[in-house]
Amino acid sequence: MMNYKFISTIKFKEDLSKLDNSVVKTILKYIKKLELSDNPKVYGKELSGNMAGLYRFRINNYRIITKFENDKFTIEGLAAGHRRNIYNIYSKRLIK
């Protein structure tokens, strides 16, 4: 089976730049684990409602929101942030 490749959107990179360095290192380490997995979806949870089709991954108190392109074996990083506000932040991006 092929490994997935993680692709960061500009917004995802902006989100990471707002986080503490130690948190960013933990998130990047987790992303590497996803890339090396044959089936990274098992580590996450599929979202519903206005985020249907997207997946979220828990990294301590932080979350990353992603979209899978299965035919290309890619995971697109859409948003990253604290669990308290990540869903509100991403919902606002969907409205724009």
PLM features: residue spans?
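A short, surface-exposed loop/turn module that caps and links secondary-structure elements
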Residues: 32-56
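Enriched for short, Lys/Arg-rich terminal
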Residues: 1-5, 14, 62, 67-96
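Arg/Lys-rich, positively charged N-terminal/basic patches that mediate binding to nucleic acids
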Residues: 1-29
